[in-house]
């Protein structure tokens, strides 16, 4: 894969994007892709159902645990992204990363050549994540869109892109749902850390390309705000 930072105008192009979108595409001094999309999780909730149950929007994970008995008593649950697998067959690690980052942990060593998944912070995050399923009975796999619409999962975490799906496929819910930041972890100083992992899809250029300059021009055009806005509308 071609190092895009080798192009003279790379930095001016990279400035289009948030730093967090470029970071996963970088290694040492090289950058091997331009972000095409970036998503991150937020907390969706049904205002009508939470109001009927007299439940407040949870600010922390402790708040989530406190509200679970009331939800489950009404045959409802809090939704986390599926813990089973991704469409490509891999494990869904988003929940683990969310809890890891909120507790001050890191996924990789500073040189990015090894993971830190055996660190005490990572082990604690993994233990808490699994306890949400084993001890508190959250669904391991479910359809958030359908169950949020039906009301059996009136609150849960999903990528912000669910906003568009709900607007199109559940027009009857207009005005009775909303979204906010995910529940966070309380720091030692009393503040709440609501860090979430992002997911980036990117465009790359193969190092064996015979026309790297033309490929670079195409990638710049495709990832521009004007082109992406037009693509999204059409």
Q: Where is each model-derived feature located?
A:
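Extracytoplasmic/periplasmic solute-binding protein
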Residues: 24-36, 41, 63-114, 153-155
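Short, well-ordered alpha-helical scaffold segment located
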Residues: 30, 48-49, 162, 226-227
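Short glycine- and hydrophobic/aromatic-rich loop-to-beta-strand nucleating segment
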Residues: 41-45, 100, 203-205
């Amino acid at each position: 894969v071609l190092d895009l930072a080798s192009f003279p105008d790379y930095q001016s192009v990279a400035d289009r994007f948030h730093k967090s979108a470029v970071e996963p595409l970088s290694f040492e001094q090289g950058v091997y892709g331009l972000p095409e999309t970036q998503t991150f999780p937020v907390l969706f909730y049904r205002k009508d159902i939470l109001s009927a149950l007299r439940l407040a929007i949870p600010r922390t994970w402790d708040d989530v645990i406190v509200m679970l008995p009331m939800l489950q008593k009404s045959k409802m649950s809090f939704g986390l992204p599926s813990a089973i697998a991704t469409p490509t067959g891999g494990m869904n690690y988003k929940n683990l990363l969310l809890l890891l980052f909120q507790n001050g942990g890191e996924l990789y060593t500073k040189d990015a050549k090894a993971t830190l998944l055996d660190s005490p912070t990572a082990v604690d995050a993994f233990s808490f994540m699994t306890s949400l399923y084993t001890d508190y009975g959250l669904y391991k796999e479910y359809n958030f869109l359908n169950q949020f619409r039906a009301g059996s999962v009136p609150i849960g975490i999903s990528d912000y892109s669910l906003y568009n799906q709900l607007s199109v496929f559940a027009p009857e819910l207009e005005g009775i749902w909303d979204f906010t930041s995910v529940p966070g972890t309380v720091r030692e100083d009393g503040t709440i850390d609501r860090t979430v992992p992002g997911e980036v899809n990117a465009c790359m250029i193969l190092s064996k390309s015979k026309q790297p300059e033309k490929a670079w021009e195409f990638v710049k055009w495709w990832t521009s705000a004007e082109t992406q806005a037009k693509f999204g509308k059409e």
